[in-house]
Regions:
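N-terminal anchoring/stem segment of glycosyltransferases
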Residues: 1-58
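C-terminal catalytic/acceptor-binding lobe
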Residues: 3-11, 16-18, 25, 131-205
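Short loop/turn segments at strand-loop or loop-helix junctions that form parts
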Residues: 5-12, 39-41, 67-68, 96-99, ...
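A short acidic (Asp/Glu
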Residues: 16-17, 47-49, 73-77, 105-106, ...
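Acidic/proline-rich low-complexity IDRs
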Residues: 31, 81, 91, 101, ...
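Conserved catalytic core of nucleotide-sugar-dependent glycosyltransferases
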Residues: 55, 69-150
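Short aromatic/hydrophobic "clamp" motif used to bind/position activated sugar donors
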Residues: 62
Length: 205
């Protein structure tokens, strides 16, 4: 059972600061044993577009992540063990909350039920093509969580207390393009929203 990574490479205007942050994560991720490392650099991707691409890998573990996220070998090993031992793999989905990374001595769990930068599937799922959900926009994770939990009836967990991936965004709010000068959100993904509460790997049944 292979593990694949799907991510974008996007910023609304040319921004060398964001590009450097994305590059930092890319250099980390490319050293890992991903079977496929798929990067959409044509536009801001949607969950729909990634899930369509993931249909090429129906027997693999497929990770959708933002470009400022990176992983390590322990994450991949723990993830592989989880799916190997889970009976109904197609029903298991993970929506993970980030660990903010500045350096090896400064890593903090964001500990939020309403924020997931990473979603993981065995194979893929079908979303309504009439509703395109963009990555990296406020509420995109909560909207996707609602569809997965309420419409598709998947078993969705957030074991980010144990399963740690890292978010590298030291530039913070200064490069968030959905904020105005007062640091207020100027957009949000509409529709029903759900939160995914934090848990440990041992809580997944």
């Amino acid at each position: 059972m292979n593990i694949n990574l799907f991510t974008g490479w996007f910023y609304d205007t040319k921004n060398i600061i964001r590009e450097n942050e994305f590059n930092f994560c890319y250099e980390k991720n490319k050293k890992l044993n991903f079977n496929q490392y798929y990067i959409d650099n044509t536009k801001r991707p949607t969950y729909n577009s990634f899930l369509n691409e993931m249909k090429k890998y129906p027997n693999d573990i497929n990770i959708i992540a933002n470009p400022d996220n990176f992983f390590d070998d322990k994450f991949l090993n723990d993830l592989h063990n989880l799916y190997t031992n889970y009976k109904d793999k197609e029903k298991l989905c993970l929506g993970l909350t980030r660990w903010d990374y500045l350096n090896e001595n400064d890593i903090k769990h964001f500990r939020a039920k309403d924020s997931q930068d990473v979603f993981i599937f065995y194979g893929s799922v079908d979303l309504n093509t009439e509703e395109q959900i963009p990555l990296g926009r406020p509420g995109c994770d909560n909207r996707l969580a609602s569809i997965l939990m309420c419409d598709l009836k998947l078993n969705v967990f957030n074991p980010s207390m144990d399963l740690k991936y890292y978010h590298y965004h030291p530039s913070g709010d200064s490069t968030r393009t959905y904020l105005n000068e007062k640091l207020e959100r100027t957009e949000v993904v509409m529709g029903a929203h759900e939160f995914i509460h934090l848990c440990s790997l041992n809580d997944i049944k």
